[in-house]
Swiss-Prot record:
Its EC number is 2.8.1.12. It is an enzyme of class 2 (transferase). This is Molybdopterin synthase catalytic subunit. Residues 151-163 have a biased composition (Basic and acidic residues). Heterotetramer of 2 MoaD subunits and 2 MoaE subunits. Also stable as homodimer. The enzyme changes between these two forms during catalysis. Keywords: Molybdenum cofactor biosynthesis, Transferase. Substrate binds at L43, C44, R45, H107, R108, K123, K130, R131, E132. GO terms for biological process: Mo-molybdopterin cofactor biosynthetic process. It comes from Brucella melitensis biotype 1 (strain ATCC 23456 / CCUG 17765 / NCTC 10094 / 16M). Pathway: Cofactor biosynthesis; molybdopterin biosynthesis. SUPFAM superfamilies: Molybdopterin synthase subunit MoaE. Belongs to the MoaE family. It holds the Pfam family MoaE.
Length: 163
């Protein structure tokens, strides 16, 4: 499916938090052709009450370039009218935002698929590394990638039915 080369695209890799409502407004304000805006917000979670913070490290130029590459693939696959991707780095506490994907399109299917595609690829391909900082003051280990994340990404590599 042809992407729209004039689609507004915003990619940010930063330490500062983001305002989800402001990002939705930025992509959709005064845009009457948009019929759907899908957002995904990834949060830092503490599954067992032991996590004080998650430290995200990255290669500055490489992270932005890889996310841009993934965004361009999404724009080629789905007819999007706007796309915003924000990924944070640094020390992030449980409950705080880590990543935001806002995908806008004329129809919901394209927006949902693009957001899902981008998250599946960012979980496995974006050059970010996570290390736990525990509530008792000790440094936890590096967080390994999960097999289910790899499986989710692989589904996008399978031949697609017409969309």
């Amino acid at each position: 499916m042809d992407g729209q080369p004039t689609c507004p695209l915003s990619i940010s890799v930063r330490s500062e938090d983001f305002d989800i409502a402001a990002e939705i407004d930025r992509i959709g304000k005064n845009r009457r052709e948009i019929g759907a805006i899908v957002t995904f917000t990834g949060l830092c979670r503490d599954e067992d009450g032991q996590l004080a913070a998650l430290e995200l490290e990255h290669y500055p130029g490489m992270a932005q370039a890889e996310i841009s590459r993934m965004a361009k693939q999404a724009l080629e696959r789905w007819p999007l009218n706007g796309l915003t991707i924000i990924h944070r780095y640094g020390l992030i506490k449980p409950g705080e935002n880590i990543v935001l994907v806002v995908a806008a399109s004329r129809h919901r299917h394209a927006a949902f698929e693009a957001a899902s595609f981008l998250m599946d690829y960012m979980k496995t391909n974006a050059p970010f590394w996570k290390r736990e900082h525990l509530a008792d003051g000790t440094a936890g280990g590096w967080v390994s990638s999960k097999e289910e994340d790899e499986e989710s990404r692989k589904r996008w590599e399978e031949p697609r039915k017409s969309e």
